[in-house]
């Protein structure tokens, strides 16, 4: 009975921890569901920035690229290189997915440092980078999970599931657990780094408003770019792994 009671108390404690939220949130009711309004607002802003930038850069393509077109061609070539390195020769269909992930995360991360979200007042909570919310990073990680399952199944059919009993059926639970830990590691790594960066800047601004935060903000911009690259690279690596069938 004591063991059972301790187990129940442990589960209750874990349930309480799972209900803890980081900061206050501004909620919207959409179709009976409660969603974080500030995340949707900032995500729409990021998407609008990406669409507007791409439209302006390629609306009148030139044989000799202009500055904007040249920049986006460089970004596309960079994403192609990352995809080809991680996925292999069949990387082509996955370039749009990897590129979307990289650009959305990159602009989201930078928006937390460059856009004055704090001046927009909300009834509850405050605006911040979309990747500062665990819901966004988990959603991106789940999309990646769907992508690599789809890649494996489309390439190998039901034979894809044979990887779970390789090299021995004894490893079946571990191999299954590995596929669940991939999205967890992706989401928490991105969320933790972006949240920590913004918290450090806020604390330093409150202590020394004009001097110390500047180098920290530049470091944050560099870190934000690295996090976007890591996420996109790992997503491509997982897709390539599912298509090749080896670890």
UniProtKB/Swiss-Prot annotation:
UniProt-recorded Gene Ontology molecular function terms: proton-transporting ATP synthase activity, rotational mechanism
Pfam families: ATP-synt_A
Primary location group: plastid
Keywords per UniProt: ATP synthesis, CF(0), Chloroplast, Hydrogen ion transport, Ion transport, Membrane, Plastid, Thylakoid, Transmembrane, Transmembrane helix, Transport
Location of this chain's protein in the cell: Plastid, Chloroplast thylakoid membrane
Listed transmembrane segments: 38-58, 95-115, 134-154, 199-219, 220-240
InterPro entries attached to this UniProt entry: ATP_syn_F0_a_bact/chloroplast (IPR045082), ATP_synth_F0_asu (IPR000568), ATP_synth_F0_asu_AS (IPR023011), F0_ATP_A_sf (IPR035908)
Position of the signal peptide: none
Residue runs in coiled coils: none
UniProt membrane topology term: Multi-pass membrane protein
Keyword check for Transferase: no
GO CC terms of this entry: chloroplast thylakoid membrane; plasma membrane; proton-transporting ATP synthase complex
Biological role: Key component of the proton channel; it plays a direct role in the translocation of protons across the membrane.
The protein's assembly and partners: F-type ATPases have 2 components, CF(1) - the catalytic core - and CF(0) - the membrane proton channel. CF(1) has five subunits: alpha(3), beta(3), gamma(1), delta(1), epsilon(1). CF(0) has four main subunits: a, b, b' and c.
Family under the similarity heading: Belongs to the ATPase A chain family.
Name of this protein: ATP synthase subunit a, chloroplastic
